[in-house]
């Protein structure tokens, strides 16, 4: 049976990611790789949105991915799982870079102000550099593909013994797991590209697979939703007060106890809240859920293009740049999804979409979304 609350978490979180990237592009906190501050405000108070959502939004998506992986594997073999994840995750983050995302790479490099020496390099070399620079938001599926392969190895060893044991997880264990998440955040972090956090994201992915894929655990999370929500809101306020104005995405903040505990308890609160109040499907949720993957893949191109054309030169008022950037994120994101998903080779290379499956097969697979 399909878990609609899981779908709803996924597409709502993707919307949050899009809005986050808007504020990230024009942040006043000195985070590099983007346009930066374009307003005349002494303090950009609306940047606080980044502090409210950044610690937990990708943690939550990896938990959802872990849950979805378990749901898929209940009806498929390990071999089918690897094949599916390779098509859904590896192909778009490798072949997709060469087929389409080099465009994003060009925009990213232009925003960064690449030097004149690049223009003197051979065309093929420039193309490869642009393709690699176009990775952008696809880091998520690169990490997820590696974790999916690791999951297959783990399954061959544990043979559901650990999974069955994890079904007994109670609220005390859920609270104490915050310490495990903090420990995981300290290891396997790449030194320069801060988004590749294999320790943290690997930990919550496997927690999603082993713990949150149990219906009885979700019932406990639903029951204790008021507690988790209260703690999460308190940690959110504390995080914003302590760190606002600082680079929240890098050391030492992104490995601090406050960062990781906020991420953990907010994830618990959202899972409990959505399972309790948003376990439904209607035409609106179906529309957003169906297009969430395409929006995730393409939204940054619209945003960064507007940033390059108008934000970098500040040729129009700041408020207009914000509005135009947000509109471009959604408009181009959804438009490219509709176009690319209909072109045979590119739908496979860029979005990881193979042949269309019969509706009955889709229903059996349940929550098998690309982000799972």
Q: Language-model segments: which ranges?
A:
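Alpha-helical transmembrane segments and their immediate juxtamembrane cytosolic regions
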Residues: 1-372
């Amino acid at each position: 049976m399909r878990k609609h609350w899981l779908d709803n978490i996924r597409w709502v979180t993707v919307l949050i990611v899009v809005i986050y990237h808007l504020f990230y592009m024009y942040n006043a906190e000195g985070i590099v790789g983007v346009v930066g501050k374009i307003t005349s405000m002494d303090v950009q108070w609306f940047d606080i949105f980044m502090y409210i959502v950044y610690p937990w939004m990708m943690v939550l998506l990896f938990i959802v991915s872990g849950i979805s992986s378990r749901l898929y594997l209940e009806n498929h073999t390990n071999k089918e799982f690897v094949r599916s994840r390779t098509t859904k995750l590896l192909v778009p983050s490798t072949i997709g870079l060469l087929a389409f995302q080099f465009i994003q790479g060009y925009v990213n490099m232009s925003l960064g102000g690449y030097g004149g020496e690049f223009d003197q390099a051979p065309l093929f070399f420039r193309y490869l550099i642009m393709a690699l620079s176009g990775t952008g938001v696809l880091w998520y599926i690169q990490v997820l593909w590696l974790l999916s392969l690791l999951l297959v190895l783990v399954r061959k060893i544990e043979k559901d013994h650990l999974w069955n044991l994890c079904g007994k997880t109670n609220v005390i264990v859920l609270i104490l797991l915050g310490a495990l998440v903090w420990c995981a955040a300290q290891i396997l972090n790449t030194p320069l590209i801060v988004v590749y956090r294999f320790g943290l994201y690997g930990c919550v992915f496997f927690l999603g697979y082993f713990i949150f894929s149990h219906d009885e655990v979700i019932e406990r999370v639903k029951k204790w939703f008021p507690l988790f929500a209260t703690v999460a809101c308190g940690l959110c306020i504390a995080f914003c007060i302590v760190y606002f104005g600082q680079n929240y995405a890098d050391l030492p903040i992104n490995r601090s106890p406050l960062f990781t505990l906020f991420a953990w308890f907010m994830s618990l609160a959202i899972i409990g809240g959505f399972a309790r109040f948003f376990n439904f499907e209607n035409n609106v949720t179906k529309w957003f859920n169906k297009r969430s993957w395409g929006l995730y893949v393409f939204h940054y191109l619209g945003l960064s293009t507007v940033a390059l054309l108008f934000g970098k030169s500040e040729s129009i008022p700041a408020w207009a740049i914000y509005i135009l950037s947000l509109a471009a994120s959604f408009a181009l994101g959804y438009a490219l999804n509709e176009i690319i998903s209909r072109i045979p080779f590119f739908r496979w290379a860029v979005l990881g979409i193979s042949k269309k499956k019969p509706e009955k097969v889709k229903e059996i697979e349940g929550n098998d979304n690309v982000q799972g």
